[in-house]
Amino acid sequence: MNFISIIIPTFNEEKYITKCLENWFNQDYPKENYEILIFDGKSTDKTLDVIKELQKKHNFENIKIYTNEKRKQVYAFNEGIKNANGDFFIIFGAHAYPEQDFLKNNIETYQRIKKEEPKLAGVGGIINKISENMSAEIAKVIYSTPLSGGSSFWYAKEGFFSNTVVYGMYDTKMIKESEILFDTDFITGQDFEFNLHLIKEGFKLYTNPNIVSSYYTRSSVKKFIKQTISYGAAKGLMIRKGYFNILWLFPFGFLFMLLSIIITGLLIFIYIMAILIDTIRLLIKTREPLYIALPILLFLFHCLISYGFFKGLIKGNSTFK
């Protein structure tokens, strides 16, 4: 049976790490066949104490704790790959937790797809968004639509070859032989860039919606605004590095439409209609009243991510410094 390494960066995660690790300890996959590598960025809360207590409580031996001296997640990811003993490694987050069949479904998916696609380097699934307050609920609403420019792992219903995977499981040997690591210029969006780099080098990725994890969305307006601007900046930096995806341009299109209003109102009409149609679709699907506000929320979201995009495009990696 395949051995799997799970790489989890942490920094002041005492609120979320218990749910994360307990779900990892209770996988329907043999405990002796996976390890958990924690890379802690010098937490100042009780994160490390909680981890050690959980390890003792569950009698889980295959857990190792490292200090992430540079603190940022991107460095933890690269160190995790170097220290991974598994046939596969998984990049995960302490702000999330996997379903009980997460490991089993990853392995089964990889083995099945690998038979038809020998260049398969990794697989991933979808994310359920958990909202703890109204700010987090607003973030959930925004990411529920493709018009946010977000990745399909938020809403995919069927399996498909994708250009990125969330909390992906990768073939350790293929990645190490390719010498592809996470680009440390990216403090945000580093996983997206890593996946695009794999695609650029001819590898394949696959998303299976049966591989499920849950993620706590940003719990404050300030954190969400900062994250959104950072995501935009990351995409601007990706274009500077030679990557491109047409979906990235949708959030920024409204800026050009505002400039074109004197010439024609057609583009603005298309923009508004696209948002209204998707608002109606989501209202019918979810029956949640908050989706009525989606047009306004998307407009504000597009403003923020556009600002970040042009900041990243102009300033490059200095945006994150």
From Swiss-Prot:
One of its GO terms (molecular function) is hexosyltransferase activity. One of its GO terms (biological process) is N-glycan processing. Keywords: Cell membrane, Glycosyltransferase, Membrane, Transferase, Transmembrane, Transmembrane helix. InterPro entries: Glyco_trans_2-like (IPR001173), Nucleotide-diphossugar_trans (IPR029044). It is a multi-pass membrane protein. Pfam families: Glycos_transf_2. It catalyses: an archaeal dolichyl N-acetyl-alpha-D-glucosaminyl phosphate + UDP-2,3-diacetamido-2,3-dideoxy-alpha-D-glucuronate = an archaeal dolichyl 3-O-(2,3-diacetamido-2,3-dideoxy- beta-D-glucuronosyl)-N-acetyl- alpha-D-glucosaminyl phosphate + UDP + H(+). It is found in: Cell membrane. One of its GO terms (cellular component) is plasma membrane. It is an enzyme of class 2 (transferase). Its EC number is 2.4.1.335. This is Dolichyl N-acetyl-alpha-D-glucosaminyl phosphate 3-beta-D-2,3-diacetamido-2,3-dideoxy-beta-D-glucuronosyltransferase. It comes from Methanococcus voltae. The gene is aglC.
